[in-house]
């Protein structure tokens, strides 16, 4: 249940966030897609931990492919 709610909130962010913010991600997949993949693969707690760590790394000049 927590995973589904989290994924729905992330998808809401993906639809409502300004284009400038959404296009700023330097990683592939995007940080929000990475969070969804991590939640689906590793569950709520570990998935969010991985997603938050990824967001912390999302600073210039970092970037490139980074899969969960």
UniProtKB/Swiss-Prot annotation:
Q: Name one Pfam family in it.
A: YidD
Please report which protein family the annotation says this sequence is part of.
Answer: To bacterial proteins yidD.
Name of the protein this chain belongs to: Uncharacterized 7.9 kDa protein in int-C1 intergenic region
The lineage, from the top, is: Viruses, Duplodnaviria, Heunggongvirae, Uroviricota, Caudoviricetes
């Amino acid at each position: 249940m927590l995973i589904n709610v989290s994924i729905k909130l992330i998808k809401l962010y993906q639809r409502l966030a300004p284009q400038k913010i959404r296009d700023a991600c330097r990683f592939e997949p995007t940080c929000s897609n990475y969070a969804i993949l991590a939640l689906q693969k590793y569950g709520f707690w570990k998935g969010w931990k991985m997603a938050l760590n990824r967001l912390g790394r999302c600073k210039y000049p970092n970037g490139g492919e980074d899969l969960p």
